[in-house]
């Protein structure tokens, strides 16, 4: 049983690592894949598992962008250190809407909207939005092509888009990148800022889920600890690959391919539900 669950944890870790950073909804994919790959664990554990393996994905961002995010780096001059601190304060500002809106509604969303039809609907809706906005921006020059020039108010509005991602199937990265592009950032700046916003957001949600798990009187078994560790390690490795792929891809391409993917997957899910 443990061996089979480890294999399933590896698969879910791969799904998390790829889909967390691509704008296609990691939670949506985990819900869909998890409905097929049943581990035989309690619902409380699986709800917590789907969020806790995000620690691996978060670590990937920290590792890849450590120099850029480290204000204490001796390789940075005084101006660069100041810019790094400013970036962090903008990230904190951007996270506030999710704290105010997302955290209080998180449990309600999990209970009422963590369903395949909701995931499918959001996949389709945001897929259409990606295609429409990319077509609209085809001949436009981004107003903000450098992360250091991103205005404070723009950072806050991007954070408001992140708050929308509490609906399963939306995609945290998808909502923030879409919002950033809509406001006027380049794809590259929108993606990077989305990654950095993920650090406090995902750590906060994961801690919340772990706290809820233990508050309800649950404990980890030895096997469950192994499953969690495997999921996090795999998520970390795949996230490294996923982030590098995305940042290389958007240097020459737009997000429409992800929009079409979302629409096709959403239609397939809805079709499967009604067959």
Curated annotation (Swiss-Prot):
Keywords: Antibiotic resistance, Cell membrane, Cell shape, Cell wall biogenesis/degradation, Hydrolase, Membrane, Peptidoglycan synthesis, Transmembrane, Transmembrane helix. GO terms for molecular function: undecaprenyl-diphosphatase activity. Its EC number is 3.6.1.27. The chain crosses the membrane at residues 4-24, 44-64, 85-105, 113-133, 149-169, 188-208, 226-246, 255-275. InterPro entries: UppP (IPR003824). GO terms for cellular component: plasma membrane. It is found in: Cell membrane. It is an enzyme of class 3 (hydrolase). Coiled coil: none annotated. It catalyses: di-trans,octa-cis-undecaprenyl diphosphate + H2O = di-trans,octa-cis-undecaprenyl phosphate + phosphate + H(+). It holds the Pfam family BacA. It is a multi-pass membrane protein. Belongs to the UppP family. HAMAP family: Undec_diphosphatase. This is Undecaprenyl-diphosphatase. The lineage of its organism: Bacteria, Bacillati, Bacillota, Bacilli, Lactobacillales. The gene is uppP.
